[in-house]
Amino acid sequence: AALTGHLVLSTLHANDAPSTIARLDEMGVEPFMVSASLIGIISQRLLRRVCSHCREPYRPEERELGRFGLMASREADVTFYRAHHHSPNEPICPHCQGSGYKGRVGIYEVLRIQEEMATAISKGASTDVIRQLALESGMVTLLGYSLELVRRGETTLEEVGRMVLTDSGLESERRARALSTMTCEGCGAGLQEGWLECPYCLTPRH
């Protein structure tokens, strides 16, 4: 139906938006059909929202920030929060019932199929190539979206690590970004002009 001009909305389980192309291929959908009919992909998840009444401000260590691809110097003005863990003799927060979290907030990754992307899909491009093209066109990843919520005080690094951050996922994102930037010899992460060492693995830059 999509090939004949109808707007078709469907759901599919995949780790992120770029991985959806591979999932369609596994289901037997030919690449040329995907490139001709697909206009966009939205990947979404839910994170627990940290309780605004009992959350605790703190300063993450560089190692913790590095795990998420963040640099302490760039996050100096950000107030990070973590969930409050109540002790046995402490009154329970009436708003979150002592869980430290109340409600949920959505995170989204929107991949728009543009001409260059469609051409790559029709040629059977790998997920890494699809991800690289998506990042170059301005796609905000699930990790990037969730870290922005952390900066706004809506959730925690702990929750992002639990629900979003995976070694393979972060490595794929780093690899895609590194293809068009200077690359760390230690972990392959993309580097920027002026960095003396890799913020992710602390390997000195040569």
Identify the function of each model-found stretch.
Residues 1-206:
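Short, flexible helix-loop junctions that flank or precede catalytic/ligand sites
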